[in-house]
Amino acid sequence: MSSIIKMFNPKSIALIGATEREGSVGQAIMKNLMMGKDKRSIYPINPKRDVVMGLKCFAHIKDVPEHVDLAIIATPSNTVPSLVEECGLANVDGVVIISAGFREIGEEGAKLED
């Protein structure tokens, strides 16, 4: 299956930045993933948590026990470059970044975006 198909129909999803913190982006995405009716594996990633919404939480994407089709990164912009690199090293097929603090905040954010 091609990487683009896996992005739109992933069998396994890792949410980097998963949390139960009320009002956070990581919580909102996690809730939406958990409400999905299709059968796919969901892996919360957060080095500060052991469990998120009843699922075992992993410290890093490399710790996930199966191949990840899609990683969603919902963390501050300064963490994104190293997390994308970790996803590449873990052979993740696709990455979606949901973050702020890039070009819209000025020159420093633009450097991160590039």
Locate predicted features.
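Catalytic-core regions of core metabolic enzymes
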Residues: 1-114
